[in-house]
């Protein structure tokens, strides 16, 4: 939730929609599926998330537990689940892809601090570092209008150049 919207999921569900998110090494993808009549609701919710994500000890602990359970489900609780963790460090020696998005071990998640989470959010979550995709039976002019209305006033954040090291050629 955010400082303004505590019941994000409930609002989406009442509008006839659903939402979720996933991460990869290169992106975090938040998505909402709603009837077109409620399109503006999605813009309002996402701009509010970008403007005022709620950073509370409770929200951090809830998300920490969710991610720990995802880690266990994906890597520890299934046969050969840890193979992806093991292969990364074999395939990549310098590139950030050597590190799993979710952390290399449960302690990485458990020990994440509020300051680290805030720093990451404020470094990466801004309209100038986001891609908005709207699909369905909607008009382009409406999407442009809603984009400007809900995201236009959000302050750009400093762009960060990712200095990704060149991965040495693999010989084995």
Feature map (PLM): residue ranges:
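M16/MPP (pitrilysin/insulinase) zinc-metallopeptidase core fold and M16-derived inactive scaffolds
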Residues: 1-33, 99-103
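Histidine-acidic residue clusters that define the catalytic metal-binding segment
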Residues: 89-130, 158-166
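Short, solvent-exposed loop/turn segments at the edges of secondary structure
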Residues: 7, 12-14, 24-27, 82, ...
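M16/insulysin-pitrilysin zinc metalloprotease superfamily fold
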Residues: 2, 33-64
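An aromatic/glycine/proline-enriched structural segment found at the starts
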Residues: 94, 98, 131-172
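Acidic/histidine-enriched alpha-helical segments
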Residues: 13, 54-72, 139, 158-171
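Buried hydrophobic packing residues in well-ordered domains
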Residues: 1, 12, 30, 46, ...
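Non-catalytic accessory/assembly modules
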Residues: 58-65, 78-86, 138, 145
């Amino acid at each position: 939730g955010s400082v303004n919207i505590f019941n994000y999921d409930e609002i989406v569900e009442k509008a006839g929609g659903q939402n979720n998110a996933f991460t990869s090494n290169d992106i975090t993808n938040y998505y909402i599926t709603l009837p077109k009549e409620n399109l503006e609701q999605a813009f309002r919710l996402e701009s509010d998330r970008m403007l005022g994500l709620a950073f509370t000890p409770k929200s951090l602990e809830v998300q920490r537990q969710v991610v720990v359970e995802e880690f266990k489900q994906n890597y520890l609780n299934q046969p050969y689940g840890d193979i992806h963790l093991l292969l990364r460090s074999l395939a990549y020696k310098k590139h950030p892809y050597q590190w799993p998005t979710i952390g290399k071990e449960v302690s990485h998640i458990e020990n994440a601090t509020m300051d680290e989470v805030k720093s990451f959010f404020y470094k990466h979550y801004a309209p100038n570092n986001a891609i908005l995709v709207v699909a369905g039976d909607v008009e382009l002019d409406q999407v442009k209008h809603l984009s400007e209305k809900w995201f236009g006033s959000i302050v750009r954040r400093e762009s960060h150049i990712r200095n990704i090291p060149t991965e040495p050629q693999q010989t084995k």
